[in-house]
Amino acid sequence: MRYYIIAGEASGDLVGGNLIRAIHEQDTHANVRCWGGDKMETAGATLIKHYRELAFMGFVEVITHLRAIFRNIEFCKKDILAYKPDVLVLIDYPGFNLRIAEWAKKQNMRIAYYVSPQVWAWKEKRVEKIKRDVDKMLVILPFEVDFYKKWDYKVTYVGHPLVEVVREEKNNVPVISLSDKPVIALLPGSRAQEIKVKLPIMLRMVKYFPEYCFVIAQASAQPDSLYKEIIGEEPVLLVKDQTYNLLKQAKAGLITSGTATLETALFGVPQVVCYKGNAVSFWLATKLVSVKYISLVNLIMDKPVVTELIQGELTEANLKTALTRLLQDEAYKKELKQDYETLWHSLGDKHASVNAAKEIISLASGNV
């Protein structure tokens, strides 16, 4: 059967890559066309657009790129029509994918959505469009089942795809040592604009902790030059395509909010969650977003498990205080370890990619 899959960010590429492998295992004649990244292409899909051409974050940034966004939407529609998929699979990326879903429904296409938009955080009324346009919603967070139940919309919890990825990495991939010193991981994000804002603040920690080796996880879609310009003469390491190897040996991490916070927690690394965006975008977000926390770890656990330094709170002094606590407060580290274990078990031992592929293949076969 023919599968058209759309992911617009690095996290979606990771999820999509594992999904595509699972689809090929269950449907040996599968033909997959996608918008995504290197992982999806490596898994066996024909890559049409790379997410680095699509990833705009924040209200202001989206507005300034509206022409490119609408051009991509029109190109996507034409490409889907030409391909004639048995099922359209949308992975997160709601600003783009919900528009495509509305259009595709009018074309009488079968539509699966894997990784729900965070409608529980903001613009909750989008659920009405999801109910109208999406045939099968596959969620990855346990609390999303009850959220959608409020809207009388039955969804399928398949498990969190990161659990299976991290389990495989922990069990089967040996650690390659990065330094003789204990390591602190810096994950400044995958988009150029967020790296330019957060990495300089993270690098200010180097002088306070000379007994540690600071290692930056380079986003695969970003050039070396972006990082080297920011790093300057700082004595740090820059590694590419080694994020999990880095997390397996890190004593602590300074982590950009997003999927990386959950990955870091699943590897058991004490972390400080860092967020700093465009001032106008952040102000608008505070008016529209209705969640207590910014990190997935705290959202899932429904309590402040990890420290979040958001916008004006992300200062050199605050970051130093938070990192010192991670490295030196043994009671806090013990409590954090226990919370991380609870988090792991709350996400279950489901095989998300296999379960999602099964549901998608069933839908492609005409079973809604």
Feature locations, PLM:
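Nucleotide-activated sugar donor-binding and catalytic core shared by glycosyltransferases
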Residues: 1-368
